[in-house]
Amino acid sequence: LTQNAADVCREALQIAKQKGLTISADMNYRSTLWNYGRHPSEIMPELLGYCDIITGDIDTADTYFGIKTPADLSIENKFRFCCEALLKKLPAFKIIGMSFRGANEVQQPTYQCAICMNQEIILTPVYTIPQTTDRIGSGDAFMGGLLFGFLQEQNAKQIIYTAAACGVLKHSMEGDFSIISIGEINQFIQSGPVN
């Protein structure tokens, strides 16, 4: 966007932190928003330093912080490696959540989520998504589930399973937002990874 936008964000984050508010951020990198002469690594690390809850992905951790997660690791070990490196750069965070997309042997989309909370790492099972209506907004749904779980004072496992349910269920809805009931989330979690 612009340097002015970054400055306003910094000021808002400082005020929110002074007021004791919980601050969340989706650190996904959008290259089309960075056309004003500064690299995101010059702006985002400082802004993310104010945040308590962060979602994102391994590639963005590299773009913002230079974290080179080895590609040959399992998803769990990639997440662990990235979180350990992020913790050194963002020591104040309470939760980091990530979702991982893939495909199974018959090329159906898969979705798995991970959380780091209180230095505990938990992964969900791998969910197969046999039919996708629209995946746009699934990251926002994932973050919504993460925030909901946090605000409900769920434990780390409950939070990441809630977030995963929101992310997976969004794939069945048209448009870039989702409206999911708590009953639907709980039913999804109880039915397990074959959904």
Q: What are the residue ranges of the model-derived segments?
A:
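Ribokinase/PfkB-type carbohydrate-kinase core domain
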Residues: 1-122, 128-130, 181-187, 193
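Conserved post-catalytic alpha-helical subdomain immediately downstream of the catalytic base
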Residues: 122, 126-191
